[in-house]
C-alpha cells in the first residue's frame, strides 16, 4: 500500500447533511477499495484564493490514507463526475523522506508529536544527559 493525501472542496451552497454525506461517500470509496484512512481534517467553510465556478467560498476536507495505486483512478473519476466538487487533488508520497513527511502530517492532524520531533527530543535529552555527566566529573576532579 502507498501513502496518499487527498483534499477536495465542496460547493458552499450545500447544507450540512449534504456535506456530511459527500464526505462519508468518499471515505467509503477509499475503505471499500481496501484503503485505510489514517486521519482526516474537516477544515470547514473557507474563502477561496480565487473564484471557482462563480463561488468565492468552499467547504474543505482533507484525508490522509494508505491504498493501492489502482484505487486512485476510481477516486479521481468519482470526484470529476460530482458537480458538487469544485476542486480536488490527490498527492502520492513515494520516497522515504516524503513518507516521513506524511507521517508527520498525520501526527500533527492527530495532535501527536511527530516521529521526527521525537527523534530530535531523544537526541537532545541524550546530549543534555552527557553534558551533565561531564560537568559532574569536572567538579569531582577539582
Swiss-Prot record:
GO molecular function: small ribosomal subunit rRNA binding; structural constituent of ribosome
UniProt KW keywords: Ribonucleoprotein, Ribosomal protein, RNA-binding, rRNA-binding
InterPro entries: Ribosomal_bS6 (IPR000529), Ribosomal_bS6_CS (IPR020815), Ribosomal_bS6_sf (IPR035980), Ribosomal_S6_plastid/chlpt (IPR020814), Transl_elong_EF1B/ribsomal_bS6 (IPR014717)
Keyword hit for Heme: no
GO CC term (a single one): cytosolic small ribosomal subunit
Keyword rRNA-binding in record: yes
Top-rank taxon, per record: Bacteria
Disordered: annotated segments: 110-142
Entry-linked CDD domains: bS6
Pfam families cross-referenced by the UniProt entry: Ribosomal_S6
GO biological process, one term: translation
PROSITE patterns: RIBOSOMAL_S6
Family statement: Belongs to the bacterial ribosomal protein bS6 family.
Functional summary from the UniProt entry: Binds together with bS18 to 16S ribosomal RNA.
Protein name, UniProt field: Small ribosomal subunit protein bS6
Amino acid at each position: 500500500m502507498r501513502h496518499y493525501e487527498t483534499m477536495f472542496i465542496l460547493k458552499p451552497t450545500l447544507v450540512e447533511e449534504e456535506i456530511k454525506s459527500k464526505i462519508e461517500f468518499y471515505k467509503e470509496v477509499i475503505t471499500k477499495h481496501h484503503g485505510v484512512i489514517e486521519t482526516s481534517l474537516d477544515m470547514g467553510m473557507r474563502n477561496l484564493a480565487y473564484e471557482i465556478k462563480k463561488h468565492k467560498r468552499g467547504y474543505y476536507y482533507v484525508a490522509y490514507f494508505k491504498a493501492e495505486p489502482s484505487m486512485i483512478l476510481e477516486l479521481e473519476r468519482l470526484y470529476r463526475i460530482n458537480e458538487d466538487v469544485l476542486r480536488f487533488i490527490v498527492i502520492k508520497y513515494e520516497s522515504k523522506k516524503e513518507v516521513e513527511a506524511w507521517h508527520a502530517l498525520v501526527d500533527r492532524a492527530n495532535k501527536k508529536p511527530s516521529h521526527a520531533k521525537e527523534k530530535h527530543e531523544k537526541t537532545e535529552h541524550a546530549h543534555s544527559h552527557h553534558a551533565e555527566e561531564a560537568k559532574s566529573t569536572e567538579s569531582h576532579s577539582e
